[in-house]
Curated annotation (Swiss-Prot):
Lineage of source species: Bacteria, Bacillati, Cyanobacteriota, Cyanophyceae, Synechococcales
NCBIfam families documented for this protein: PRK14646.1
Keywords of the record: Cytoplasm, Ribosome biogenesis
Organism name: Prochlorococcus marinus (strain MIT 9301)
Subcellular location(s) of the protein: Cytoplasm
Name this protein carries in UniProt: Ribosome maturation factor RimP
Length: 155
């Protein structure tokens, strides 16, 4: 699928999502699969949690619009889901919701040779992120943080 058609598909799906007070968190099209797999992760615009029913209610109109658009001339699988474990934390709501959960923090390595830190999400302020690493609180300035993701305790 070329970039132009992917962009058209994304706009089409955003319109469907907006009608249901949803937004597209991410869109991934796996053209190396047969049939093509279209993975869509949705979020509610009001910040509430996405339910299984929300995913199901988005699926039918999204599929209908894809069919009407004729952007795909092949068979495809449409997968609708909500944001889940191992996703990046970005919003204030994410940080409040997942306080105490295990996180991976990817660092930019400007001031440190350490690339990743793992711990429990403790606190987020405007200037720093605090994580609990084996009972000790480590404050990391945000200018040193590249990415914060949920993980499992094994990670």
């Amino acid at each position: 699928m070329n970039k132009e058609n992917k962009s058209k598909l994304e706009k089409l799906l955003e319109n469907v999502a907006n009608k249901q007070d949803l937004e597209i968190y991410s869109l991934n099209i796996q053209t190396n699969q047969n049939p093509i797999v279209i993975e869509i992760i949705i979020k509610k615009t009001n910040g509430n949690d996405v339910s299984l029913d929300d995913c199901a209610l988005f699926n039918t109109p999204a599929s209908d619009e894809i069919e009407k658009s004729n952007l795909l001339n092949c068979s495809y699988v449409l997968e609708i889901s909500s944001q889940g474990v191992s996703d990046e934390l970005t919003s204030e709501r994410d940080f409040k919701t997942f306080k105490g959960f295990p996180v991976n923090v990817e660092l930019n390595q400007k001031n440190s040779k350490i690339k990743f830190l793992n711990g429990l999400l403790y606190e987020k302020s405007n200037d720093y992120l605090a994580i609990n690493i084996k009972g000790r609180i480590k404050k990391i300035p945000f200018d040193e943080v590249l990415k914060i993701s949920l993980c499992t305790l094994k990670d």
